Amino acid sequence: MVTTGSRTILVAHPGAEMFGSDRMLLESVIGMVETGARVVVALPARGLLDGALRAAGAEVVIVPMLVLRKVLLTPTGLPHLFRDLFRGLGAAWRLIGRVRPDAVYVSTIIIPQWPVIARLRRIRSVSHVHEAEASGNRLVNALLYLPHLASNSTLVNSRFSLDTIRGALPALARRSTVVYNGVGSPDDPEGPRAEIDGALRVLYVGRLSPRKGPDVIVDAAAALRRRGTDVTVTLLGAVFEGYEWYEEQLREQAASAEVDVVFAGFHTDVWPFLAEADVLVVPSRVDEPFGNTAVEGVLARRPVIASDSSGLREAAGGYSTAQLVPADDAEAVADALTVVRAEWPRIVSEVDAARAEGLRRHAPAIYRAAVAAAVLDTAL
């Protein structure tokens, strides 16, 4: 581990919730704090992440910043984009001048002002890319990645992300290094039940959005019900503001299909829900740069069914207790759930080996050390 008692790292992050990229930001900051560095985190708002960062030993400041969202690229959103851009540039310039960091760590590509201002301030910076949509417009991808050429180096969370960058902006890919996400878990998670008596308990963890595909699980459960198999579904997550219509649509879908669906809402602690589940399904319709949720399922000693696409292949691939299925295919998910039920004794016998492999691949300590070393080496 790199150790330092005299360096200051400024970290910029676009949100204050506790979803995937937020949790990885927290792990990154813990790694930096463990080196003895002073770590100052800039957020655009207060939230659950704010308190977790302070508990980890970081300082937190709230500053205006441009956070790229699709809504800003609409005719009504453009005035807000330019307002946030100029406010964000000024705030970043002033904060870097006040903190005087040795390095700036930019978490995600959707806060483009930070590497640019760091370069203008002659402060070295590291960008960490958690976003990748190979199926997206290549020009749009290139424009999103372009500001991060101002960083001195780039970390990416999967080979898929690296390949996506290479297809859009080869110059950035040549300066990028893959660091797989570190995923924490309980020391001794509850094992699966010895046999399935009654309904198969299916769990979904994540945002309730069409892109993430929880409706695919409801359709798969309906298909199993038609086949005579009893299934219960728990949806652990909430909608983005403005997507309340989608949750209502899910509720209507479940009621119409007569599927037993529990809307559990958002919880920061997913492990009790994994302990109650038999199988975790990750049915994303769109490209995922990685798939922390799939790894959490493996670490929880549960079988996993995930879309056979993008970074999910890296997250869920190579485990005997995980199945990859075509994206947006409810019948394929239903077939995979049938396999889980039919092969339950084998799965139960193999979940410990799968967990051991997941721990090897995604140990938080290794991730923290790798990110801290990249940032501090950049500052040398």
Name the predicted role of every residue range:
Residues 345-376:
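A charged, aromatic-enriched C-terminal amphipathic alpha-helix characteristic of glycosyltransferases
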Residues 318-331, 338-344:
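Conserved acidic donor-binding segment of nucleotide-sugar-dependent glycosyltransferases
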Residues 47-48, 89, 103-121, 136:
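An aromatic- and histidine-rich active-site surface loop
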Residues 247-265:
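Nucleotide-activated donor-binding/catalytic signature segment of Leloir-type glycosyltransferases, i.e.
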Residues 19-30, 200, 204, 209-223, ...:
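A conserved mid-protein helix/loop that constitutes part of the nucleotide-sugar donor-binding site
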Residues 42-48, 183, 205, 232-248:
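Glycosyltransferase donor-sugar binding loop
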Residues 303-306:
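Short hydrophobic beta-strand element within catalytic cores of glycosyltransferases
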Residues 160, 182:
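Carbohydrate-associated surface elements
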